[in-house]
């Protein structure tokens, strides 16, 4: 019996008496979870008209690959850092540790990308190594123009992939809201080297992410065919988009600070595809101190400007994030997250995500992994009823929205190998259909 089989058998007792995720009649379209007809089969390839996001599991960082309805593609983050050195806090590194994350991610993208190795957009949510790679961890180094480049994260993936345009919060001056190097843990230096290299090698274009913009991230191949698809930039550099389209600077009081929390600088998006809505905002969570000595919760301020969505990526991997007002504002039917640590999706976060006081509707919490140690620790907690059991074995989470946006599917795909075998799937109707 291997470690994973032992874990499966050992966890039966703690889970007895915990209900499985339930489906409200009217938002389920077919059998769910392990009984779904896709289980055991290869994940179907993207088809024109679908909006698909792959939350790629590596166990060491965050990465998402988007395929938009007309085939426009985007790699959002490509993290790698020494998470495997965290001892008992580490989660499974999959498929194995023989390759670094950047290479695994590039191989995954090439399998599912209709354009194979060509990717329209690269976007880095913020300058942290678990989202971009770092100088001290990777598949070696290379010399270029008098610089030593770390083959890690984004740069390693770019050995196989070619990006046309890149969005970054700091480009070109890297000084908003304060000089970005004051927030740097090494990832910014790594990224700036990678950008310079890819601009010279591939002619990659750089753009500053504009908070408040609608359509900066645009369909590049046949936008006219999908007028109901739009991406709105809602957060970045500590600013948020208000409902009226204006922009509020949450850090206006801190422009002379010596250091700021990089997580609060994260880039955030809301996608609308017909009736379907999706939210993602990197690690957007911070509690900066105000001039009067009190603290402001950035998620609470953002919540005032948001409406409900169908699927939401959990902020900051669920590490003491997702304030109750934000959960209540988003009211997601499905919550998902990229995970690389036992401390991700902490119990307090899960309690808020599962709170029926925040909103009464059923919901599915579908992280890339919900590790065994956490299940022992949280045995008997009510929030376990909302967690997808497929996460117990870890896997890629793939969201596929049908053409037009009326229905969507969330599937787990094995990360143990590159077979793309589906291990569980859930079908839903977008909430505003028929509203």
PLM region descriptions:
Residues 78-81, 127, 237, 282-284, ...:
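Active-site metal-binding loops of divalent metal-dependent hydrolases
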Residues 69-74, 79-166, 302-319, 331-335:
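Active-site metal-binding motif and surrounding structural segment of the metallo-beta-lactamase
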Residues 5-27:
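N-terminal export signals
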Residues 297-397:
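Long, structured stretches of catalytic cores involved in phosphate-ester chemistry, encompassing
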Residues 63:
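N-terminal cofactor/phosphate-binding cores enriched in small/glycine residues
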Residues 28-52, 58, 108, 115-116, ...:
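Flexible, acidic/histidine-containing loops and adjacent segments that form or flank the divalent-metal
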């Amino acid at each position: 019996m291997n470690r994973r089989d032992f874990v499966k058998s050992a966890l039966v007792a703690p889970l007895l008496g915990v209900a499985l995720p339930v489906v409200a009649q009217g938002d389920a379209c077919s059998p769910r979870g392990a009984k779904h007809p896709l289980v055991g089969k290869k994940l179907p390839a993207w088809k024109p008209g679908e909006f698909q996001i792959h939350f790629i599991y590596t166990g060491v960082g965050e990465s998402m690959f988007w395929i938009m309805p007309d085939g426009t593609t985007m790699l959002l983050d490509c993290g790698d850092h020494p998470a495997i050195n965290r001892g008992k806090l580490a989660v499974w590194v999959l498929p194995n540790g023989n390759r670094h994350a950047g290479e695994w991610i590039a191989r995954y993208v090439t399998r599912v990308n209709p354009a194979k190795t060509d990717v329209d957009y690269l976007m880095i949510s913020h300058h942290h190594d678990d989202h971009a790679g770092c100088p001290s961890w990777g598949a070696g180094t290379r010399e270029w123009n008098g610089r030593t480049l770390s083959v890690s994260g984004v740069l390693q993936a770019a050995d196989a992939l070619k990006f046309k345009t890149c969005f970054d919060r700091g480009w070109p001056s890297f000084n908003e809201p304060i000089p970005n190097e004051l927030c740097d843990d090494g990832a910014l230096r790594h990224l700036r080297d990678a950008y310079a290299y890819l601009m010279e090698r591939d002619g990659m274009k750089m753009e500053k992410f504009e908070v408040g913009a609608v359509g900066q991230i645009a369909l590049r191949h046949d936008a006219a065919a999908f007028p109901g698809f739009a991406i709105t930039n809602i957060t970045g550099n500590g600013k948020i988009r208000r409902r009226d389209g204006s922009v509020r600077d949450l850090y206006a009081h801190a422009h002379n600070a010596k250091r700021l929390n990089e997580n609060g600088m994260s880039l955030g998006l809301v996608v609308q595809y017909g009736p379907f809505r999706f939210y993602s905002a990197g690690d957007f969570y911070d509690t900066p101190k105000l001039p009067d000595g009190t603290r402001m919760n950035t998620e609470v301020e953002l919540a005032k400007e948001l409406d409900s969505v169908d699927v939401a990526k959990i902020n900051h991997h669920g590490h003491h994030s997702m304030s109750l007002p934000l959960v209540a504002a988003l009211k997601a039917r499905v919550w998902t997250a990229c995970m690389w640590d036992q401390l991700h999706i902490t119990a307090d976060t899960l309690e808020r995500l599962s709170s029926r006081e925040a909103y009464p509707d059923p919901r599915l919490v579908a992280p890339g992994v919900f590790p065994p140690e956490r299940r022992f620790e949280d045995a008997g907690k009510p929030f376990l009823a909302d967690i997808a059991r497929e996460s117990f074995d870890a896997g890629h989470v793939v969201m596929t929205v049908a053409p037009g946006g009326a229905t969507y599917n969330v599937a787990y795909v094995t990360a143990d190998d590159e077979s793309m075998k589906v291990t569980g799937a859930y079908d839903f109707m977008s909430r505003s259909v028929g509203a």
